[in-house]
């Protein structure tokens, strides 16, 4: 503990983390300030807000939003920082089918535009199948298997 590993500070500038509970990361007084906080520019923040469908909420307080809106704002705020790696912890929790489809479409568009790596932690088979190129099945903290989309289908098909 006396010495940090070399380069330990560099990773947090490259990795954007979105927590399962958006309340853990929403702290600014408006959606605009939340998404603009770490954004590479105000214009890019507005572009990301538009992509995530939250631009119309620009002047609202994040805590006044629905859970689905909070989730989209929290992901948009991290995405606006333009990280090389976007780590999403259960991004579709609490979403109805329409919300899940919309969020998956947004995340796929974001990936196509930015070219960033997305790592998604999920128990939602639909989310995994729609977002992943590679899948890792983990049990008791150990990777049991890895593969492509076919692994998701194979593992979760009765």
Residue spans for each PLM region:
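Catalytic Walker B motif of ABC-type/P-loop ATPase nucleotide-binding domains
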Residues: 86-89
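A short, surface-exposed alpha-helical micro-motif characterized by mixed small hydrophobic
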Residues: 128-130
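Conserved ABC ATPase signature
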Residues: 61-65, 69
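Conserved ABC ATPase "signature" region
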Residues: 43-57
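H-loop/switch region of ABC-family ATPase nucleotide-binding domains
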Residues: 122-123
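Hydrophobic anchor residue at the start of the ABC signature
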Residues: 75-76
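Conserved beta-strand-loop-alpha-helix hinge in the C-terminal portion
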Residues: 142-158
